[in-house]
Amino acid sequence: MATGGYRSSGSTTDFLEEWKAKREKMRAKQNPVGPGSSGGDPAAKSPAGPLAQTTAAGTSELNHGPAGAAAPAAPGPGALNCAHGSSALPRGAPGSRRPEDECPIAAGAAGAPASRGDEEEPDSAPEKGRSSGPSARKGKGQIEKRKLREKRRSTGVVNIPAAECLDEYEDDEAGQKERKREDAITQQNTIQNEAASLPDPGTSYLPQDPSRTVPGRYKSTISAPEEEILNRYPRTDRSGFSRHNRDTSAPANFASSSTLEKRIEDLEKEVLRERQENLRLTRLMQDKEEMIGKLKEEIDLLNRDLDDMEDENEQLKQENKTLLKVVGQLTR
């Protein structure tokens, strides 16, 4: 449940209850109550209830809890006796006393019992000093808010460098757009100035031959070096010079591009001739391969005929032998 930046822990609640009990004990010691006051008079005991409720409400406020949070445990009988004693005094009312006035007295009086208590935490003294008074509450709230900001910054919720980078990027884009717009205006003005001041191609800003007669307006620009001209004329005139330089270099570029185009055309023609020659040689090779295949087939046929003729020759030899034998037998 959100408490407006304040934390309420169990240790702080226990410490406040112990401190309250010690304060009541010290009040009881400083203001001893007679035996008659502890009798059964209901009028004397009646303020104890509202006083206990007021004390519990003050404790809940010191604990920085919400208004609807549960009240701490009710004090013991000693607290009730102290309530009687304090109600008897005019300056002991809870409305007339401030927590800032009670804390130093209670802290000094509870110094000896606090050293003997084992249940108190080591940081009870700083907590006691910081948890009293609106200034302490304000300082604690600021500390909690700073911790919360640091926690958010560590998780990346707050990313200041990214916003700065975005701002720088937007500034760069705006500067680029402004420069582009200025360049466009400059180029347009340059074209207009050229159209107005250069009616014929003979008059230009380019360095020309000193022997030629030129208007007095351009004599200094003709004799001056290029760096001096660039330093003398503004940016618009510089863009005009660069444009004229590009115009003069355009014929040279055109000539070089025309020679390159001719060279490319010659190379394309040569490549075409080579392709045609390659195609012719490929066809010739295919024809030769076909001829070789036919010759191989003829060789195979001739080899078969040769084998048949050899077989026939062997058969004829055998027949000749048999005929010779028959003739030899007949001649006998």
UniProtKB/Swiss-Prot annotation:
GO biological process annotation, one example: response to iron(II) ion
Position of sequence motif Nuclear localization signal: 137-153
Segments of this protein annotated with the region Disordered: 1-253
Bias (Basic and acidic residues) ranges: 174-184, 234-247
Positions of post-translational Phosphothreonine modification: 155
Biased composition (Polar residues): 1-14, 52-62, 185-195
GO molecular function, one term: leucine zipper domain binding
GO (cellular component) term, any one: cytoplasm
Induction behaviour: In ventral prostate following castration.
Residue ranges, compositional bias (Low complexity): 65-79
Coiled-coil boundaries: 176-198
Keywords: Apoptosis, Coiled coil, Cytoplasm, Nucleus, Phosphoprotein, Transcription, Transcription regulation
Motif (B30.2/SPRY domain-binding motif): 61-65
Phosphoserine: modified positions: 223
Assembly and oligomerization: Homooligomer. Interacts (via the C-terminal region) with WT1. Interacts with THAP1. Interacts with AATF. Interacts with BACE1. Interacts with SPSB1 (via B30.2/SPRY domain); this interaction is direct and occurs in association with the Elongin BC complex. Interacts with SPSB2 (via B30.2/SPRY domain); this interaction occurs in association with the Elongin BC complex. Interacts with SPSB4 (via B30.2/SPRY domain); this interaction occurs in association with the Elongin BC complex. Component of a ternary complex composed of SQSTM1 and PRKCZ. Interacts with actin.
Free-text note regarding domains: The leucine-zipper domain is not essential for apoptosis, but is required for sensitization of cells to exogenous apoptotic insults and for interaction with its partners. The SAC domain is a death-inducing domain selective for apoptosis induction in cancer cells. This domain is essential for nuclear entry, Fas activation, inhibition of NF-kappa-B activity and induction of apoptosis in cancer cells.
Function: Pro-apoptotic protein capable of selectively inducing apoptosis in cancer cells, sensitizing the cells to diverse apoptotic stimuli and causing regression of tumors in animal models. Induces apoptosis in certain cancer cells by activation of the Fas prodeath pathway and coparallel inhibition of NF-kappa-B transcriptional activity. Inhibits the transcriptional activation and augments the transcriptional repression mediated by WT1. Down-regulates the anti-apoptotic protein BCL2 via its interaction with WT1. Also seems to be a transcriptional repressor by itself.
UniProt name for this protein: PRKC apoptosis WT1 regulator protein
Species the sequence originates in: Rattus norvegicus
Lineage: Eukaryota, Metazoa, Chordata, Craniata, Vertebrata
Encoding gene, per UniProt annotation: Pawr
